[in-house]
Amino acid sequence: PLIRRLAKYVIDADTTGNGFPDLGVANTFDDAAPAVQFSRKQVYLAVKALAAFEVTALMAESNGDEEFAGICRDRAALIQQTLDTEAWQGDHYAVCLEKRMDEITDPWSGKPAGTGELPGWDAYSIHTANGLLYPLLSGYRLNLDYARLARDIAHATREAMLEYGCTHSSADRSNLWVSQNLWRDFVAAYMGLDLLDMASRYWAFEVMENT
């Protein structure tokens, strides 16, 4: 079945055994800092993977496939453990676990991204909880530390703030996506965080862009 194949792909994308995907990880935040855009072991993608595994386990269980449901639950638990032990920075989740850029390839050029420490690997990101929205909209709460996620959202919002909203992360100081700000705001609402006053910033941005 297609769902099983997709879940297997995400499992195979982790080659280090910590649950975090490190293959095929370049995303569509094409104006973001390298750590956000194409680093390996991204927290943003790990949370998405965890969400995928938990809901796939529910689907497998409802179809009588207890074995595969167990595999998916185990993968979700592994990601959660890595999030708590390796990604948590005390007041926020890091952008990624990859701290060096020596083996990272820029997917746009096909060339090495550089050498030395990866700038922004431990930055504050507004995308951490991105993968939670669809499960939350359907009434399902993933097995995660929501107190930490709420702190992450609050602190990332503060650290990435500019006049018209937040950049991708505190390592990005120019590009802003209103759509991803709104997505963050929706997830925040489910955690009891009221970011409604951000709407005035987004409207001011639209007015500025269209004047």
Question: Where are the predicted features?
Answer:
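Inter-helical turn/loop segments and adjacent helix faces that build the functional surface
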Residues: 56-73
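TPR repeat positional signature
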Residues: 46, 50-53
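Extended ligand-binding clefts on enzyme/binding-domain cores
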Residues: 39-46, 77-209
